[in-house]
């Protein structure tokens, strides 16, 4: 089982992936908020043998920016947990201006 956390941004998202044992497999993969960006994320995941059957994704509902990545992944049958920003407010304060830290926090939350 794999656990992916995505920190959502207007133009760029940052992803962090943990293995079942909690070991980071990647911590700061940036990808653009485009179809090509989503495809680059899938390429990275497939290289590690992560697939819809063995991957859980968590992402924060940031404005409307999360909708495109959610739709992209949902259309490919990935299991996605949308996290309320109120729940993650403490992490934003712990990692101000640090999407890498927030992506890791979201990954640990869905694990």
Language-model regions, residue ranges each:
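Phosphate- and other anionic-substrate recognition elements at nucleic-acid/protein interfaces
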Residues: 1-111
């Amino acid at each position: 089982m794999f656990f992916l956390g995505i920190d959502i941004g207007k133009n760029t998202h940052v992803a962090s992936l943990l293995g079942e044992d909690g070991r980071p497999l990647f911590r700061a993969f940036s990808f653009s908020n485009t179809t090509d960006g989503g495809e680059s994320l899938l390429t990275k995941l497939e290289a590690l043998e992560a697939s819809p059957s063995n991957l859980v994704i968590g992402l924060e509902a940031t404005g409307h920016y999360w909708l495109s990545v959610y739709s992209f992944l949902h259309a490919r049958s990935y299991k996605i947990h949308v996290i309320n920003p109120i729940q993650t407010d403490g992490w934003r304060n712990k990692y101000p201006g640090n999407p890498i830290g927030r992506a890791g926090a979201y990954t640990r939350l869905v694990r």
